[in-house]
Amino acid sequence: MIKSELFERITEKKTYIPAKIIEYVVKNILEYMSLSLEKGNRIEIRGFGSFSLHYRFARIGRNPKTGEKVYLKEKYVPHFKPGKQLRDRINNIYKKI
């Protein structure tokens, strides 16, 4: 699902809320989450999961196209850890398949 599909689905379910308001709220939630991660904060949404930053050490990688060695700098990457309720919900659906 992409952001525009999220707007559409919420708008379909909450017909009494103008689409512009829904778009504004979703964009602001995502922006505040991004700003919080930029500051190094952890974000926890109970029942859904948590977002944090993971440190990646500098290393020697490989260009898959050419095979040549490439130096990769150290960096922080966003990480999502699903909460127990989300994991259980997904596992219950796919257990049936």
Swiss-Prot record:
Would I find Oxidoreductase among this entry's keywords?
no
Entry keywords, A to Z: DNA recombination, DNA-binding, Transcription, Transcription regulation, Translation regulation
* Family annotation (InterPro entries): Hist_DNA-bd, Histone-like_DNA-bd_CS, IHF-like_DNA-bd_dom_sf, IHF_beta
* Signal sequence segment: none
**The UniProt record lists the keyword Transcription:** yes
**Coiled-coil region list:** none
User: An example of a Gene Ontology BP annotation on this entry?
Assistant: DNA recombination
Supply one GO molecular-function term: structural constituent of chromatin
Q: Which GO terms describe its cellular component?
A: chromosome; cytosol
Which Pfam families does this UniProt record tie to the protein? Bac_DNA_binding (PF00216)
Family to which this protein belongs = Belongs to the bacterial histone-like protein family.
* Physiological role: This protein is one of the two subunits of integration host factor, a specific DNA-binding protein that functions in genetic recombination as well as in transcriptional and translational control.
Assembly mode = Heterodimer of an alpha and a beta chain.
Q: Which NCBIfam families match?
A: hip, PRK00199.1
Protein name (Swiss-Prot/TrEMBL): Integration host factor subunit beta
Q: What are the top taxonomic ranks of the organism?
A: Bacteria, Pseudomonadati, Pseudomonadota, Gammaproteobacteria, Enterobacterales
